[in-house]
């Protein structure tokens, strides 16, 4: 019985160590992911927008809740509260950072089909146009974008 109790104690200690390591990795990943997504949102839509990830343990598993902020407040339904352009841009930023953080390192190529169909307004479109080459260079990524939108012409354009 004593041996079984010692074994249980060892297992519980190991579980605590794994939990501490997992939380450290989550904080590090959160910092990298949130900074890229927030920067994209701020660049295009203004500094009042932000992004964070809330990690929560449920039934022995960690779940991540992706949260868009406006003026520091959580948007419960960002699609209806801000429009699809915010979602389009956040989705792109999440795709980009997932490629950058993937291990083993993957080829940094991302093909997108109409990624900004919900971005409306000349000022927002111009900001997206300026953001794309900057992100591609900074994150060492190649972007291939299929679109019928003339406003999205960035870099080398191939028409079919």
Regions found by a protein language model. Name each.
Residues 53-57, 68-72, 94:
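Flexible glycine-/small-residue-rich
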Residues 113-115:
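Walker B catalytic acidic pair
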């Amino acid at each position: 019985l004593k041996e079984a109790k010692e074994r249980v104690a060892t297992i519980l200690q190991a579980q605590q160590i794994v939990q501490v390591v997992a939380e450290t990795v989550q904080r590090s990943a959160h910092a990298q992911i949130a900074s890229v997504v927030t920067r994209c949102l701020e660049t295009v839509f203004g500094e009042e927008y932000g992004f964070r990830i809330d990690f929560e343990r449920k039934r022995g598993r960690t779940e991540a809740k992706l949260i868009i902020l406006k003026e520091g407040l959580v948007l419960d339904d960002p699609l209806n509260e801000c429009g699809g352009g915010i979602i389009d841009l956040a989705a792109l930023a999440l795709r980009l950072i997932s490629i950058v953080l993937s291990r083993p390192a993957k080829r940094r190529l991302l093909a997108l089909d109409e990624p900004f169909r919900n971005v409306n307004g000349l000022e927002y479109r111009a900001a997206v146009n300026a953001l794309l080459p900057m992100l591609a260079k900074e994150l060492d990524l190649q972007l291939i974008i299929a679109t019928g939108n003339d406003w999205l012409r960035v870099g080398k354009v191939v028409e079919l």
